[in-house]
Amino acid sequence: MSERKLFTSESVSEGHPDKIADQISDAILDAILEQDPDAHVAAETAVYTGSVHVFGEISTTAYVDINRVVRNTIAEIGYDKAEYGFSAESVGVHPSLVEQSPDIAQGVNEALEVRGSLEQDPLDLIGAGDQGLMFGFAVDETPELMPLPISLAHQLVKKLTDLRKSGELTYLRPDAKSQVTVEYDENDQPIRVDAVVISTQHDPNVTNDQLHKDVIEKVINEVIPSHYLDDQTKFFINPTGRFVIGGPQGDSGLTGRKIIVDTYGGYSRHGGGAFSGKDATKVDRSASYAARYIAKNIVAADLAKKVEVQLAYAIGVAQPVSVRVDTFGTGVIAEADLEAAVRQIFDLRPAGIINMLDLKRPIYRQTAAYGHMGRTDIDLPWERVDKVQALKDFIASK
């Protein structure tokens, strides 16, 4: 009998409290970058019933109306009614942003590699904004080269949001969560969906039967390919029986608390650093994007079926302290050769990553819900596969 292996990932909608915080932080970042592409930003947000607190450190020449950005973001998410207990019009906004520490700025603005040097490479000028380790991952389970569980989980909550915003399901409210369990065969290939959990906030007048019927027909059956579903697939729709109170009225939210949702759903390792509210000199964000870019191009080049890339940095130093490529036995060449190719083809200094992926643009708010990786609905530079030929050429030359 073949071994049955299950793997589960979850996602949350843009109306989840932690995701509200992420979107506010990234909306502030984008507003600053629109005026000052060289700004250094670390904006954190906390939300709870009736209040939003924005705090952190910035260095910028820009002036941004934080109050307006916060309220616009909340309204766009869909918290625009007093009965939700959290609305764009009535929420209290409390900003507390201060100047970036000069000790940190010293290492970011002038990397170790150029201090005291007469010959300077411009891309050596920016040092990593902190120490840390970052992971990128790709696998051939889906067209976007993502693990199937997180891909489906994102699509489910995005579909709920689309149905809410289009007016097709008027009783839906902004907060929602999904969870998908996928069964894999002995070759680690996904063969079926074993369980789906969806909890969605709703108006008090909708019946559980109606909600259950609509979620099955209009969400699950529309999102999950039919060949993954069978009569053994379990559906848990609002299993508590009621989800009227949600969003920040139900739970407080904080930037950076959904880092597994933001990446690979637990299928790959995570270095621990969050993304939202941080400009690209923070390698927590930019190097994670670079690692995904590398991993996706390796799989797209058919050099491995599954690959995880680890990068690590020291604060104030431009060059990564380590680069590691793990193909989990699926690679067609030695991992040492792949690592050599990565170092040759991808500039992994912070300034190199920023240039390579054009990260000084205000593109971040759109990443703050439904995942930073594997997106097919928006054009993100780290999702492009434009290094495939360079990788193949390098390997062929060895």
Swiss-Prot record:
Region described as Flexible loop: 100-110
Any one annotated GO CC term: cytoplasm
Species per Swiss-Prot/TrEMBL record: Streptococcus agalactiae serotype V (strain ATCC BAA-611 / 2603 V/R)
Cofactor: Mg(2+); K(+)
Domain of life (superkingdom): Bacteria
Quaternary data: Homotetramer; dimer of dimers.
Record-linked NCBIfam families: metK
Protein name: S-adenosylmethionine synthase
Binding sites annotated in the UniProt record for ATP: H16, D175, A176, K177, R242, F243, D251, R257, K258, A274, K278
Source taxonomy: Bacteria, Bacillati, Bacillota, Bacilli, Lactobacillales
Gene symbol of the encoding locus: metK
